[in-house]
Regions:
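Short amphipathic alpha-helical "recognition" segments used for binding
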Residues: 6-7, 39, 47-48
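Sec-dependent bacterial lipoprotein signal peptides
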Residues: 1-18
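Intrinsic-disorder/low-complexity detector
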Residues: 36, 41-42
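Bacterial lipoprotein signal-peptidase II cleavage site
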Residues: 16-30, 34-36
Length: 254
């Protein structure tokens, strides 16, 4: 019996030694590699300076429709702000811009006063003859001067091919005869469509309610005008299938 017990003890010790000898040492186990391969030379870089060069008016005018454009210009007037967008009439010393639904916070909209200089980046578009900047963002040009354009008298250009060269500028007309006044939807509160005559030509102008709403003097003035009245007008030389000035002032012709 004693020999059997001694034999069993010896066998147990031998098995324990074998188990210890085959245990893996964690300190010597190689860790998996986490190194990221370096990019090859044909991979395209990301990021970078995306600031576009500011165009002159001549460069903007020459740009193709749908081209990306960046301009610096001065606010002359705005339409009503709505849902983080605002439409801007702008100008510089060389030309004018209609910036349609510019992306803008309500706080910044309040700062877009006449004369304020802004840098605008968007795309050049065209709709029914009106050339505009669309899908645009902007920033204020800090420390810039201010500029408010004087209306350019384009009376003598009515009916000529030269009139469109001044598209979107602040303009004036002298001694126009009222031919018809029509309220959109048939009653005051919306746009006013005004047909005027000069010489043998007739032209369609508009009191745009989002620019000059029903509480403004120019809007109210049309309640007292009638066919045959002779007036002077100021406005922005908008285009819609021909001249369609957005009227900002009207007074009796002297």
């Amino acid at each position: 019996m004693k020999k059997l017990i001694a034999l069993l003890l010896a066998l147990t010790m031998a098995l324990a030694l074998v188990a210890c000898g085959t245990t893996n040492d964690p300190a010597t186990t190689p860790a998996p590699t986490t190194e990221t391969p370096a990019p090859t030379s044909n991979e395209e870089p990301t990021g970078g300076d995306e600031t576009a060069a500011v165009m002159t008016y001549a460069e903007y005018e020459a740009a193709a429709i749908d081209a990306a454009v960046t301009v610096e210009c001065y606010v002359q007037a705005t339409q009503s702000w709505w849902e983080d967008k605002i439409t801007v009439y702008a100008q510089d010393a060389d030309g004018a811009y209609f910036i349609y639904e510019l992306k803008c916070s309500e706080e910044d909209a309040a700062k877009l006063t006449a004369g304020t200089k802004i840098r605008v980046s968007g795309f050049k578009g065209e709709w029914s003859g009106e050339v505009e900047i669309m899908d645009a963002t902007f920033e204020f040009v800090e420390g810039a001067d201010t500029f408010v354009a004087e209306p350019l008298d384009v009376t003598d250009l009515l009916g000529t091919e030269d009139l469109i060269k001044h598209q979107n500028k602040k303009v004036s007309f002298k001694e126009l005869t009222i031919k018809k006044i029509e309220y959109k939807n048939g009653e005051p509160g919306d746009d006013i469509y005004v047909t005027v005559a000069k010489g043998e030509g007739e032209y369609s102008f508009c009191v745009e309610r989002y620019l000059t709403d029903p509480v403004t003097d120019v809007y109210k003035a049309f309640a007292d005008l009638k066919e045959g009245d002779v007036v002077n007008m100021e406005g922005f030389l908008y285009w819609y299938e021909g001249v369609n000035t957005h009227i900002t002032a009207v007074t009796p012709a002297a």
